[in-house]
Amino acid sequence: MEMIRGRGIPNGVVQVPNLSANNLLQKFFIASNHFCQRDSEHGENQQEAKKREDEAEEDEKDVELTLGLSLNGQFGTDPRSRKRRHFELGRSSSIPEGFVFDEQRSGGGNGGDMRRIVGRGGSDMFQLDRTRSLPVVTEMDIEKERKVSEKTRAFMESPVTNRGAYLTKDKNRGQAVETEKPRAFLEFKIPPTKEGKKEKDRLVVTGPVNGKGKNGNTAKKQKNNVENSGMEKARNILEDMPCVSTRDVGADGKRVEGFLYWYGGNKEEVKIVCVCHGSFLSPAEFVRHGGGTVSDDDGGDVMINPLRHIVVKLPSSSI
């Protein structure tokens, strides 16, 4: 057996049976056929391997779109993929750590050499931290709250110039504020309207205060007119309803008094109100109420007109 070296063969050697020098052509054909057979087998193996890779890539295209999450998982990729480590998006921590490099985690010095730190931990610089569940207060919000608090503090500590008082920071400051509030409320004046001004002008009496001058006696005359009108009303009432009393004295030695509530031309139309009881009585009932006797036409003492036993007090005498 002879050993012939060739390219594209795993061992690079082909065993050929011993042949004479005349059979060199046969030896060449045997080696060529063997090489072609090996090349065809190797090509088939490469095609099968390529086909398997294509199928694996097609499987990787079926992305898992579920919302399920897991620790140290990935989002939107197939966990069974062989290329997962090249496309995965690792879950970051909920608490942002900032740019903490390897040297800082190990506690080496005060940060060590910055170039060495950046060189070893450069990948950490571009990692995205996971957003927090709670809303993050921005610097603008913090600055706005600080300005509002400063304005409020300055307003509370500023002097009150309009009221003529200065509020200090001592313990009596609260009492001063409480006393200034009602004073400001009392000093507030409502501007008069046109109707109120007209009413005020109508009620104001023109003329000097001491009563001298052209219209000096106006107030005094108005007062006298009010008094006179009151007396006139009382006189009219007494004239309409004059006071009456019984002529005879009763058993208790007193006369019964009342006043005429209404009267007309006939005696049946006269009504007298008793002062002691407030009852409406006829003239005969009023005389009987005072202790007198009123008889019918058939019996003993006849009082044809009971008004003779009633005394009417005129307004001039009552006043």
Curated annotation (Swiss-Prot):
**What protein is this chain from?**
Ninja-family protein AFP4
Effect of inactivating the gene: Exhibits insensitivity to abscisic acid (ABA) and salt.
Q: Does the keyword Nucleus apply?
A: yes
Region labeled Disordered — which residues?
Answer: 39-63, 99-120, 205-228
Q: Which InterPro entries does the annotation name?
A: Ninja_fam, Ninja_motif, TDBD
Assembly information from the UniProt record: Interacts with ABI5/DPBF1, AREB3/DPBF3, EEL/DPBF4, ABF1 and ABF3/DPBF5.
Q: What task does this protein carry out?
A: Acts as a negative regulator of abscisic acid (ABA) and salinity responses.
* Gene responsible for this protein: AFP4
Main location per the UniProt record: nucleus
Q: What induces it?
A: Up-regulated by abscisic acid (ABA) and salt. Down-regulated by cold and glucose.
Compositionally biased residues, Basic and acidic residues: 39-54
A GO BP term here is: response to abscisic acid
Family label: Belongs to the Ninja family.
Expression across tissues = Predominantly expressed in roots and seedlings.
